[in-house]
Amino acid sequence: MSGPLRKHHPLLKVVNHSVIDLPVPSNISVMWNFGSLLGLCLVSQILTGLFLAMHYTADVNLAFSSVAHICRDVNYGWLLRNLHANGASFMFICLYMHIGRGLYYGSYFYRETWNIGVMLLVLTMATAFLGYVLPWGQMSFWGATVITNLFSAIPYLGPDLVQWLWGGFSVDNATLTRFFAFHFFLPFMIAGLSVVHLLFLHQTGANNPTGLAGDVDKVPFHAYFSYKDVVGFVVLLAGLVFIALFSPNLLTDPENYIPANPLVTPVHIQPEWYFLFAYAILRSIPNKLGGVVALAMSIVVLFFMPFVHSSRQTSHNFRPLAQVLFWLMVVNVLLLTWLGGQPVEYPYIFLGQAASVIYFVNILLLIPIVGYVENKLLFS
């Protein structure tokens, strides 16, 4: 058979159509780089996590010591641990940028791709939460206790569900063991779902900044965009290595360097920085069940994006009013992130409630209204 092997070999053909001869709109910007960066982060996390798991002990009496042993006694264990812990932060930065790009340029109209992407977000958040528990420091223990306790707000099933999650009547050895098992398994599930995400994306083709059909002007992914992605890889890895070597504790909580003690509650229980926006929404509602529903809705609301979009234009590029709402949402999420790290007292309680209301009103009410107004101004 004539032609390159990659074009007719059963396995190489799949790779060829996915990353080499893939037709891509010629006008996509650097904002389309974050998907490949997330793939790099996932590979990095799986590899560093695999080597850490070889030395970690999932036992409440030994977990904290085993992490200290990895950092002190294992060759380059400190580097593996720093890369893994900070790699999670970099992965969430890329993830939020990827979602932001999708919201700005209307990628949610590719519904299967978008819905699987939101599922990937939920799985990644679950994996990160489980990983935060494993070092068995103070914030690990109390974070696990507080977050798993939220399931008790579910009517009728709640208390039994919490005991089933714990494997007993409190967060203990059974909890840590199953959290480690799921933390090890979920990244492979994320990798599999990412392949499905790409499969659906390549069925429709990539979006582009204009929001218009890009079929008239497409170029092969390699070499036009593969080299562009490599630049992103270099920048991301340089940033990750810099943080891991020079300031590895910049994004971590000092409270987690104290071994878990069920008898001493930390002054301020909080998750890692990338969950603080959702945590602020949870805390803003005084009712437990209401807070859990609001927490879930802060992520689930992304599923509604194709339905609340009422404008005839896909992208925000040519929609000044919609751009104002988008940047209001960005600033609001940053404000919620800051508020999630503040103590539960005035004025942070009121500010958190106001920011939470703005978050949902913006997405569920203002976006459809502005789309309708723009249609009237432009097309009537």
Swiss-Prot record:
Heme b b562 binds at H84, H183. Keywords: Electron transport, Heme, Iron, Membrane, Metal-binding, Mitochondrion, Mitochondrion inner membrane, Respiratory chain, Transmembrane, Transmembrane helix, Transport, Ubiquinone. The chain crosses the membrane at residues 34-54, 78-99, 114-134, 179-199, 227-247, 289-309, 321-341, 348-368. Heme b b566 binds at H98, H197. One of its GO terms (cellular component) is respiratory chain complex III. Binds 2 heme b groups non-covalently. Its main location: mitochondrion. Its cofactor is heme b. GO terms for molecular function: metal ion binding; ubiquinol-cytochrome-c reductase activity. It comes from the Eukaryota. It is a multi-pass membrane protein. It is found in: Mitochondrion inner membrane. It holds the Pfam family Cytochrom_B_C. GO terms for biological process: mitochondrial electron transport, ubiquinol to cytochrome c. The keyword Lipoprotein does not apply. The cytochrome bc1 complex contains 3 respiratory subunits (MT-CYB, CYC1 and UQCRFS1), 2 core proteins (UQCRC1 and UQCRC2) and probably 6 low-molecular weight proteins. Belongs to the cytochrome b family. Heme 1 (or BL or b562) is low-potential and absorbs at about 562 nm, and heme 2 (or BH or b566) is high-potential and absorbs at about 566 nm. Component of the ubiquinol-cytochrome c reductase complex (complex III or cytochrome b-c1 complex) that is part of the mitochondrial respiratory chain. The b-c1 complex mediates electron transfer from ubiquinol to cytochrome c. Contributes to the generation of a proton gradient across the mitochondrial membrane that is then used for ATP synthesis. This is Cytochrome b. It comes from Branchiostoma floridae. The lineage of its organism: Eukaryota, Metazoa, Chordata, Cephalochordata, Leptocardii.
